C-alpha cells in the first residue's frame, strides 16, 4: 500500500496542541519500533519547539525554533477544491496507480 500523505501535501492538524492549524508537509519519516511501523511527518509551522545550539567557530550559539515530527495519525489531507479535510483513496488510471480525494474525486498530482 502506498503512502496516504507525502511531501508537498497541504494538511490539517486534527489533534494535539496545534489542533486546527494548516501547513504543508516538508518531509515524511518512517520508523520501525518494537515490530511496529511508525510514520511521522514534518509540517511547516506545526509542532515548533525551542532548541539550544552551542556556539561554534562558524556560527553563534543561541536558541532556535525547529519543527518537530508529528504522528501521521494526527493530521489529515486538505481538499484544495472544497477547503475541508478529506480521506485519500487509490485508483488505477491507464494502468497507473494514483491518489485521489474521496470528498471531491479530484486526482492528487
Swiss-Prot record:
HAMAP family: Ribosomal_uL24_B. Belongs to the universal ribosomal protein uL24 family. One of its GO terms (cellular component) is ribonucleoprotein complex. The keyword Transcription regulation does not apply. This is Large ribosomal subunit protein uL24. Disulfide bonds: none annotated. Coiled coil: none annotated. Pfam families: KOW, ribosomal_L24. One of its GO terms (molecular function) is rRNA binding. Part of the 50S ribosomal subunit. CDD domains: KOW_RPL26 (cd06089). One of its GO terms (biological process) is translation. One of two assembly initiator proteins, it binds directly to the 5'-end of the 23S rRNA, where it nucleates assembly of the 50S subunit. Keywords: Ribonucleoprotein, Ribosomal protein, RNA-binding, rRNA-binding. PANTHER family: MITOCHONDRIAL RIBOSOMAL PROTEIN L24 (PTHR12903). It comes from the Bacteria.
Amino acid at each position: 500500500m502506498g503512502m496516504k500523505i507525502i511531501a508537498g501535501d497541504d494538511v490539517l492538524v486534527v489533534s494535539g496542541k496545534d489542533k486546527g492549524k494548516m501547513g504543508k508537509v516538508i518531509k515524511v519519516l518512517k520508523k520501525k519500533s518494537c515490530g511496529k511501523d511508525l510514520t511521522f511527518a514534518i509540517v511547516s509551522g506545526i509542532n515548533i519547539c525551542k532548541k539550544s545550539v552551542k556556539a561554534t567557530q562558524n556560527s553563534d550559539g543561541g536558541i532556535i525554533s525547529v519543527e518537530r515530527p508529528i504522528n501521521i495519525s494526527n493530521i489529515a489531507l486538505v481538499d484544495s477544491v472544497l477547503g475541508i479535510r478529506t480521506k485519500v483513496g487509490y485508483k488505477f488510471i491507464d494502468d497507473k496507480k494514483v491518489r485521489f480525494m474521496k470528498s471531491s474525486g479530484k486526482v492528487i498530482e
